[in-house]
Curated annotation (Swiss-Prot):
The lineage of its organism: Eukaryota, Metazoa, Chordata, Craniata, Vertebrata. Residues 239-425 form the DH domain. It comes from Danio rerio. Residues 706-715 have a biased composition (Basic and acidic residues). This is Ras-specific guanine nucleotide-releasing factor 2. Residues 631-745 form the N-terminal Ras-GEF domain. Residues 704-743, 759-814, 843-879 are annotated as: Disordered. Residues 1009-1241 form the Ras-GEF domain. Transmembrane segments: none annotated. One of its GO terms (cellular component) is plasma membrane. The keyword NAD does not apply. Its main location: cytoplasm. One of its GO terms (biological process) is Ras protein signal transduction.
């Protein structure tokens, strides 16, 4: 019996699966069976030369397999059928697959579509392996033929190349033969040709003509070149080239800084993060150094491109370089967005002592040059604005038809978009970087500065006076040298703490062992000596009322007093106003957070959190992520109206916002507008404050608010002091001065959300300053035994509104109420006088004080014994109480007086609200005016109209019959400060010294000592420097065409610098012999070194710049006589004041020195120009760029710190007459001509 054919069924099934999924042709066909000649529809799949068919397209196994190798496929006509089914069958298309041997029945298939039939026939016909083999053979033959042709062509090409080389050799040989033949022909010419000589006169004439032609050509070319050199185009190109050269130097420095960041910090910290006990995690390293390494690689490429362009000088094409840089700006954008988070992570990591120790080790690397990590992290933030300034300067010197102009303008526009974001981020992180820089300067470290919410306010030098028992001052004199030396302290004020440090000789800071870190919430500020204290009276006479006290009452240690002495009355006023404002802010925040906060433990007070205008961007304001000292988002952009609204928002006053506003308001508004706003707030507080702010100020939760709405048109809402005060207010007072005593009762059941002062059950202790107040429990109501929960956030009890307030069960609720009342009493007593007094200048007379009051010489804003303790927070949380912040203000305001508690009915509560708002508005106006007058007195000295407006407003305030005693005293203090004489009258002015200098001089340089000259240079430099009003630093006026009118004092400072430098150069060049000049140089270097010791770095730069002038620097014989020690000292001085790296050495030196000090003004002008040109003052929508204002304010604050600390140097007219004698000064050309006479140029 014949066996069946075996085949690999598994592989066949595998191929069927591939055919069903990836076959060449797939689809349903009708197949005619061989048994009964019926047609059955099957799913066919063609794969290579095998045809599979399945029952359906979902079948896993094929029903049959056909091998198509050697078969043919052709179409056949339709079958003959009866007439009935003819129409249907005519539409079907038939084709046959005929196999290659006889006896095999063909495969009959049909489809419904003709196109489908043609595709199947064509696919089956092409499914033949033999056909493919034949085609391959044909292609191989063609390929071999082409290869032979190519080889033949290569041989022919080599032959032609050889022929060309041979022909070149032949040409060279023929040329050499021609040259040789020509020489031979010359030698073979007849001798008589050379005997025909020209006439000697003709030869002379030709020679003269040749000389004349050469001279004329050279003269013409010289004129052409000279004209071009003097042309504007050449001058522009010279400046353009200089800009490019400076750009290359700056880029070199920047790449070096990035390499230090990566090699000295990033890579070592990555390795440290991989150790067994890592001081930092890899995630923190990535967060701190995001994209730093990529930025370094990018700028290394950019730097190499710049150097390649310089190699092609004078052809400088830079646009394509910036085209390379622009697509990489997204890397910078990620770095910018991460910058603030980076510094916050770094501050958190520094709390780990292991990391801090490791970081100090890295920062001590010589390559870092004493700079900190956060300094290197900030460098990339300044690079894009630096490119913008460079492009701006390049475009200024690039002709409009230049090929690069459009590319440079495009690059500048793209960079400006990123620069705007960068400036905002730098402004937002300025506070973190400042805190970290101060923390690094303190040898012992200071953990409180690692709190990123801590805001820097002020720093400066104060003298700490010694104290003895009972807190009385010992008998010391202000002029005592030992007192100034031993008692000098470097003080730093932050929003939460006050640091007192001593500075070592190396510039590092050391915190005092006792009282080095003062928590402001535990401090009480006393600005004037107690009028009843004889010792304090004497000290006021001794110290000229420049001293003030800070009484510290820590919770875990005995109380002590710190007595500080300011260098001037203006400095004292600035310090005390800032300290007082910080204490007010932190106690207000503590009051609202600990007592009136909801149980959700939210750090931001509820009223602020509920006001979307304080944190949500709008068309007229945009906020940053950074919070200010009042836990409110900082303003990034805002309209003038929104800025004035923030200034007069009665809920809070951020000290950093106030300082920035007062420094920069001239840029976007005028003093008159600010004054009008303050006057409106005082006279019409309800109409001038946004309605939403008023609602959130009271934060009531009444069911029917319509009864409490204030009528804006009500005449009693405007202050009219010509008529008696409103009856609703005056009826509750027994005197023109409103006196009310605080009364406490449980607000349970009250209809009004604020703490109702009209219902009382017990009064406060007789003295607001009593240490242990007692309070009786609230009365019980026998008619109502219900126990509603103590939820003051709703302002309404579950019981009916008609219930008596304080309806409680004695047995169950009294302890809970006692705890609440005790906590309220502590916080309220702390708030007494906080929100109503601002007196800072002069003590009140003793008759104005009642026996129970705090001493009027103490700052009422910071009363003694009224302080907030942390335990109060826990009590507040446990008692689950929440009252609107307006309650706190109501209590604090009501507690200012001492009369018996009045009782009000419900109809009088609206008037009570009016009284609260009026008191808050008065306080805000007085507070702003006090800061304005004490810190910016120049505004009122230069603007008589503004001064009269303030005086009129304050006099109007004094006529208010409802004015509280503390408000009256604060008003009088401000008026006194405005009306007093100029505080600097006792100090010398440059005009007085110039008048003295007009007298005949009696001294010469040789008769004056180096110490005398250095001291008087320092005195003159500081007098000129301190005379610059702060408004001249705004608007870049010193770079305008009318700079003399806009910034006269800055121009005087610049002129004084140039005159002093010219005097030094002229004095040296006035000597005729080498030894005298060398001795003069050595003496001037000694003067410069003494100036350095006196912190007069402006004087150091005046002298070193004079010595580096070309007229002096080229005198090699003179410098050869100068001793090596003097040269080494001069190199040290030059390094200190070098402009390299944006004066990085000078900045570090200024950071480590105590005022008085005279910095180089040009450094700050460069910073201000950098900020001004980097970003505009207003956005495209017309909003004020307040982030830019904040950066400008930081620079002005640093300048004013040095301006306001005077030198105690005695004026010596004989020395200043010599220094200011302009007859001794030579101009630059005269100096250089004299230098050439002294040492002529060596012959080339």
């Amino acid at each position: 019996m014949q066996k069946s054919v075996r085949y690999n069924e598994g592989h066949a099934l595998f191929l069927s699966v591939i055919a069903r999924k990836e076959g060449t042709k797939r689809g349903y066909l009708s197949k005619k069976t061989t048994e009964n000649s019926k047609w059955h529809e099957k799913f066919f799949a063609l794969y290579q030369n095998v045809l599979f068919y399945f029952d359906t397209d979902q079948s896993a196994r094929p029903s049959g397999i056909y091998l198509l190798e050697g078969c043919t496929c052709e179409r056949v006509p339709a079958l003959k059928v009866s007439t009935v089914g003819k129409d249907a069958l005519d539409k079907l298309q038939y084709f046959l697959v005929v196999f290659g041997h006889d006896g095999q029945k063909p495969l009959e298939l049909r489809t419904e579509e003709e196109s489908d039939c043609d595709e199947w026939v064509e696919a089956i016909q092409q499914a033949s392996y033999s056909d493919i083999i034949i085609e391959r053979e044909v292609l191989m033959q063609k390929y071999i033929h082409l290869v032979q042709i190519v080889e033949t062509e290569k041989v022919a090409a080599n032959q032609l190349r050889t022929q060309l080389e041979d022909q070149d050799t032949e040409i060279e040989r023929l040329k050499a033969e021609i040259i040789a033949l020509n020489k031979t022909k010359e030698r073979m010419r007849p001798y008589h040709v050379f005997q025909e000589e020209e006439d000697p006169d003709i030869k002379k004439i030709k020679k003269v003509q040749s000389f004349m032609r050469g001279w004329l050509c050279r003269r013409k070319w010289k004129i052409i070149v000279q004209d071009y050199i003097c042309s504007p185009h050449a001058e522009s190109m010279r400046k353009r080239n200089q800009i490019v050269f400076n750009m290359v130097e700056a880029e070199t420095e920047y790449v070096h800084q990035l390499s230090i960041l990566v090699n000295c910090f990033l890579r070592p910290l990555r390795m440290a993060a991989s150790s067994k006990k890592p001081p930092i995690s890899h995630d923190d390293v990535s967060s701190i150094f995001l994209n730093s390494e990529t930025i370094m690689f990018l700028h290394e490429i950019f730097h190499q491109g710049l150097k390649a362009r310089i190699a092609n000088w004078p052809t400088l094409v830079l646009a394509d370089l910036f085209d390379i840089l622009l697509p990489m700006l997204n890397i910078y954008q990620e770095f910018v967005r991460n910058h603030q988070y980076s510094l916050q992570v770094l501050a958190n990591c520094k709390q780990n002592r292991d990391f801090d120790k490791l970081l100090k080790q890295y920062e001590s690397n010589a390559a870092c040059e004493g700079r900190m990590l956060e300094t290197f992290l900030t460098y990339p933030m300044f690079q894009i604005p630096r490119y913008i300034i460079t492009l701006h300067e390049l475009l200024a010197h690039t002709p409009h038809e230049h090929v690069e102009r459009k590319s440079l303008e495009f690059a500048k526009s793209k960079l400006e978009e990123l620069s705007r974001v960068m400036h905002d981020e730098v402004s937002d992180t300025e506070n973190i970087r400042k805190n970290l820089a101060i923390e690094r300067m303190i040898v012992e470290g200071c953990d409180i500065l690692l709190d990123t919410s801590q805001t820097f306010v002020r720093q400066g030098s104060l003298i700490q006076l010694p104290s003895v028992e009972r807190g009385k001052l010992s008998k010391v004199r202000l002029g005592s040298l030992s007192l100034k030396k031993e008692g000098e302290r470097q003080c730093f004020l932050f929003t939460k703490h006050f640091l007192i440090c001593t500075r070592s000789s190396g510039g590092k800071l050391h915190l005092l062992k006792q009282g080095g870190v003062l928590s402001l919430i535990e401090c009480t500020l006393i600005e004037e000596p107690d009028a009843n204290d004889e010792d304090a009276k004497n000290s006021g006479q001794v110290f000229g009322h420049l001293d003030f006290k800070i009484v510290v009452e820590p919770s875990d240690a005995p109380a002590f007093t710190v007595v500080l002495l300011a260098p001037s009355r203006q400095e004292k006023a600035a310090w005390t106003s800032d300290i007082s404002q910080c204490i007010d802010n932190i106690r207000c925040n503590g009051l609202m957070t600990s007592v009136f906060e909801e149980n959700s433990k939210v750090t931001v007070p509820h009223m602020i959190k509920s006001d979307a205008r304080l944190h949500k961007d709008d068309v007229d304001i945009c906020f940053s992520k950074t919070l200010n000292s009042c836990k409110v988002p900082q303003i990034r952009y805002a309209s003038v109206e929104r800025l004035l609204e923030r200034l007069t928002d009665l809920r809070f006053l951020s000290i950093d916002f106030l300082n920035t506003f007062l420094h920069t308001y001239r840029i976007f508004t005028t003093a008159t507008v600010v004054m009008e706003k303050l006057a409106d707030i005082y006279k019409k507080p309800f109409t001038s404050i946004p309605v939403r702010s008023l609602e959130l100020f009271f934060a009531t939760n009444q069911n029917n608010r319509s009864g409490d709405h204030v009528n804006d048109k009500s005449p009693r809402l405007c202050r009219k002091f010509s008529s008696p005060p409103p009856l609703s207010i005056s009826s509750r007072t027994s005197s023109p001065v409103r006196t009310r005593k605080l009364s406490l009762n449980s607000p349970i059941g009250s209809k009004v959300g604020i703490l109702d002062l009209s219902t009382t059950s017990s009064s406060a202790a007789s003295s607001p300053t009593s240490a242990n107040p007692t309070i009786s429990p609230p009365p019980s109501n026998n008619n109502n035994n219900s126990k509603p929960p103590l939820d003051l956030s709703r302002g309404q009890s579950p019981s009916s509104p008609e219930q008596s307030p304080g309806a409680l069960d004695d047995n169950a609720e009294v302890p809970r109420i006692d705890a609440l009342c005790g906590k309220l009493r502590r916080s309220i007593r702390r708030a007494v006088l906080e929100s109503v007094s601002l007196d800072k200048f002069i003590p009140e007379s003793p008759q104005a004080s009642e026996p129970g009051e705090i001493s009027p010489c103490r700052s009422p804003s910071t009363p003694r014994h009224l302080r907030y303790r942390q335990s109060g927070v826990q009590t507040a949380e446990n008692s689950r109480c929440s009252v609107s912040p307006a309650s706190a203000f109501a209590i604090a305001t009501a507690a200012a007086g001492h009369s018996s508690p009045p009782v009000f009915n419900n109809s009088e509560r609206t008037c009570d609200k009016e009284f609260i708002i009026r008191r808050a508005a008065t306080n805000r106006v007085l507070n702003v005016l006090r800061h304005w007058v004490s810190k910016h007195s120049q505004d009122f000295e230069m603007n008589g109209e503004l001064k009269m407006g303030v005086i009129c407003l304050l006099e109007e305030v004094l006529r208010d019959p409802d004015l509280l005693p503390q408000e009256r005293k604060a008003t009088a203090n401000i008026l006194s400060a405005l009306s007093q004489d100029d505080q600097d009258d006792a100090q010398l002015k440059i005009e007085d010294i110039l008048q003295m200098a007009e007298c005949p001089k009696a001294e010469c340089f040789e008769s004056l000592s180096a110490m005398e000259i250095a001291e008087q240079i320092t005195l003159l430099d500081h007098i000129v420097f301190r005379s610059i009003p702060y408004e001249e630093f705004l608007g870049q006026g010193w770079m305008k065409t009318d700079k003399t009118e806009r910034t006269p004092y800055i121009m005087k400072t610049s002129q004084h610098f140039n005159d002093m430098s010219n005097l030094v150069a002229s004095q040296i060049m006035s000597h005729t012999d080498v030894g005298s000049r060398a001795g003069s140089i050595e003496k001037w270097v000694a003067v410069a070194d003494i100036c350095r010791c006196l912190n007069n770095y402006n004087g150091v730069l005046e002298i070193t710049s004079a010595l580096n002038r070309s007229a002096i620097y080229r005198l090699k014989k003179t410098w050869a006589k100068v001793c090596k020690q003097t040269k080494a000292l001069m190199d040290k001085l030059q390094k200190t004041v070098s402009s390299e790296g944006r004066f990085k050495n000078l900045r570090e030196t200024l950071k480590n020195c105590n005022p008085p000090c005279v910095p180089y003004l040009g450094m700050y002008l460069t910073d201000l120009a950098f900020i001004e040109e980097g970003t505009p003052n207003f956005t495209e929508e017309g909003l004020v760029n307040f982030s830019k204002m904040r950066m400008i304010s930081h620079i002005i604050r640093e300048i004013r710190q040095f301006q306001q600390t005077p030198y105690r140097i005695e004026h010596q007219p004989k020395v200043t007459q010599y220094l200011l004698d302009k007859t001794l000064i030579m101009d630059e050309d005269t100096l250089y001509d004299l230098s050439l006479k002294i040492e002529p140029r060596l012959p080339a």
